[in-house]
Structures are given as C-alpha cells and as structure tokens.
Amino acid sequence: MKMKVLNVGLVKGRHNLPVEFYVYNEIKDVLDFDALLLGAIKFFKEHSNNNQIEYNLYITGLTPATIAVIRAFSLTANEGDRLTFYHYDREADSFKKQYGFVVGFDSKFNFTYLI
C-alpha cells in the first residue's frame, strides 16, 4: 500500500505555502491551549482514513499551535503515520525538512514513536 502524503500548513493566511490543507483556518487566541488541541485533533480525525499518511507540516511560527499539532498527532495517529516538519530557510529561500515521528508498534504490540 502506498503512503498518502498531505502537505499541510499550520495557519491559513499567515504565509504563502506549498500546501493543500491547513490545520487551523484561524486562531482566535494563541494561548487557548485547549482550543488549539481540539482544533488539531479535529484536523487529524477529518483526514485519517486508516491508511498510512505522511503529514508534511509547514511550520510558520506560533509555538503553542505547533505543540498542539504534535500532541494531537500523538493522540490520533494510526500505525505507520508520519509527521514531518518543514521550516523556512530565508537564506536559501526554501524549506528545510526536519524528521518528526513515525507511529508503530514493537514486537509486543506496545505503542511506540520513532524519531
């Protein structure tokens, strides 16, 4: 089975990004951590289809939103799902890849995250 790839921006309208989807259309209060987490969980549940998905997340700042996405991924991901981060490099005018997480199970079926 081929892994589905979703290019995802953190917040719509903040930057011009090479993405099809955004986790958040808007953020009313960047310090409302519960709302951020619920919004990110909603995003992952809407895009999960029990197939392996690689989420390429383009980070645009807003650390609380990024942390909420990581937490939501850890709560909703299916086995084989991946979360990879892309950060903008001003000098190169391109995005730099940072490997994140792959969800899997060990031989005793214990849930694990591989970095």
Go through the PLM ranges and name each one.
Residues 59-67:
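Acidic, metal-coordinating catalytic cores used for nucleic-acid/nucleotide bond scission
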Residues 1-56, 68-115:
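Long, low-complexity, Lys/Arg-enriched
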